Regions:
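A short acidic, helix-capping loop that chelates divalent metal ions and anchors anionic groups
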Residues: 11-14, 74-80, 110-115, 173-177, ...
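A short helix->loop->beta-strand "cap" motif at the edges of active sites that frequently abuts
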Residues: 64, 101-102, 137, 230-234
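Active-site groove signature of glycoside hydrolases
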Residues: 96-116, 144
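N-terminal pre-domain/capping segments
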Residues: 1-101, 133
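Acidic/histidine-rich catalytic cores of soluble enzymes
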Residues: 18, 35-36, 69, 126-225
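Residues at the N-termini of beta-strands
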Residues: 35, 103, 202, 234-235
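Alpha-helical scaffolding segments of alpha/beta enzyme cores, especially the outer helices
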Residues: 23-27, 50-61, 84-98, 120-130, ...
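Alpha-helix N-cap and loop-to-helix initiation/capping positions
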Residues: 16-23, 46-54, 80-88, 113-124, ...
Length: 236
């Protein structure tokens, strides 16, 4: 596995300790990490090609691969809202292409129950996926929050070869993260992880309570073997 960080959470201190993409790149280099992930709406000074190319070259100089560029997703809403979300995802693919990021992140939210909403959601993922196939960019579906069944359903129904799973250890339905460390007994997040680990192309490892020096709400002694047994060899 490769170890990296996600340049999204810019700190609760005011002003933030890390305020820009550049500061995150430097921090990742200081930690001697393998890669860095970006979020399209956080920390970038510009979306102009010259700036993006400079950012890519800085990462190369620091020995950092770029894992993915986080976009939006959550394909629910009016026709106008869905069109805007799809176009934003395509625009983020163009940015990812310049940066050298092989993938964009797309959220799925709470499992949809209405059949028509599900169909519209899938059509959006398919349209973005088709654009990605033209420009050479993959999509990573991030559970946020989801069940294992819903992740599998979306990926299978979208049916695009450039659609993988961005495995989020904390954002499952019923996760202890939503209730100050207390899991929902109606959901088994480790079963969801077992269901979906074989689909993972990238992992977001969440940490919520580490006062003791170990994560207390999420059990990584259970998660790492799940990933290893699935043959996972990607980024963490």
């Amino acid at each position: 596995m490769k170890i990296g960080l996600y340049a999204s959470m810019f700190g609760k201190d005011d002003p933030p300790t890390l305020q820009s993409i550049e500061s995150y790149i430097e921090h990742a280099y200081d930690l001697r990490l393998d890669l860095i992930d970006f979020r399209s709406d956080r920390g970038f000074s510009s979306s102009e090609p010259d700036y993006l190319i400079k950012t890519k070259l800085t990462c190369i100089a620091k020995g950092l691969s770029i894992g993915y560029l986080a976009s939006g997703g959550h394909f629910i809403g009016t026709d106008e809202e869905l069109r805007a979300k799809v176009e934003q995802a395509k625009a983020d693919m163009d940015i990812a292409l310049i940066l050298g990021a092989p993938m964009i992140r797309l959220f799925c939210g709470q499992p949809l129950t209405d059949p028509e909403e599900r169909k519209r959601e899938i059509r959006c993922f398919q349209e973005v996926g088709d654009y990605g196939l033209k420009v050479g960019i993959a999509m990573g579906l991030q559970n946020h929050p989801s069940t294992g069944d819903d992740v599998i359903r979306i990926i299978e129904e979208t049916d695009r070869p450039n659609f993988g799973f961005l495995f989020d250890t904390g954002q499952w339905c019923g996760s202890p993260a939503f209730n100050r460390g207390t899991p929902d007994p109606e959901h088994d997040i480790y079963e969801y992880m077992q269901q979906t680990a074989h689909l993972a192309t990238h992992v977001r490892a969440k940490f919520y309570k580490i006062d003791s020096g170990r994560e207390e709400w999420i059990d990584y002694e259970r998660i790492i073997p799940i990933l290893a047994e699935a043959g996972y060899n990607g980024a963490l």
